[in-house]
């Protein structure tokens, strides 16, 4: 089996209370009906604070505001802002993952890098920029999982799992970074209101090795047993992520939780059969659409 021996995280510098973000949103929308809907969504979100790569959303932010002009930043400006800030946050998450195992990028010897993002598209991409920032060897093998949205970390971990099973000495670094708040736009549809309520910016990194390598390094962690995924075709229109002239636009239908509830038993039953497990043997399930 493969093993996740460390997980690191990082967030951008601008931290805002949800109440301050709500105030910003209501001013940006400047519409009584939208403000009323936002207040209901914000108060039921369960979120207290969010981080952003831009200072606009909270009272503590200083410097030039990204959304200061009446005209929304176009897609080019949003991509440029991502290119300025995303890699630094990703590198911070990577360094945090190594710090937790009392190691460093330089001494550990990463052989493979897998990057994950859906909030920007450009090439050469963040994979090469991260290699340069970390001074990784030029022959480090690279893979990128792009534009797969909320579930993208799982395909990335699956790739890492296959690598460590095929190459017992492989040391795989997986890093995900998303700057969702760059795509803020005050549109009145429910999908947009909901996405403006819950998403923030940040990065996470995981170091994966084979069990044999982990034992050799005397490191514990989370062992990965198996993977299983299935596509629920009837739900493909409930979530989406589309490139528009102004921003990347989210499709996030309020029916998603009910749709999952209607199909989760069937999914788990198939999972039991495919993986030869019993649902009751799993202490806790984490269910996430994507």
Regions found by a protein language model. Give the residues of each.
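Short, surface-exposed acidic
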Residues: 29-39, 50, 104-108, 138-140, ...
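Glycine-rich phosphate-binding loops at beta-strand->alpha-helix junctions
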Residues: 113-122, 282-290
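Localized chelating/binding microdomains
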Residues: 2, 12, 45, 92-96, ...
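Condensing-enzyme catalytic core mediating Claisen C-C bond formation in acyl metabolism
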Residues: 1-81, 180, 186-262, 266-270
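Phosphate/pyrophosphate-binding loops at sites that engage ATP/ADP/AMP, CoA/4′-phosphopantetheine
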Residues: 93-110, 266-283
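A structural motif shared across PLP-dependent enzymes of the aminotransferase-like
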Residues: 56-61, 120-127, 290
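Acyl-thioester C-C bond-transforming condensing/cleaving domain
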Residues: 30, 80, 84, 93-109, ...
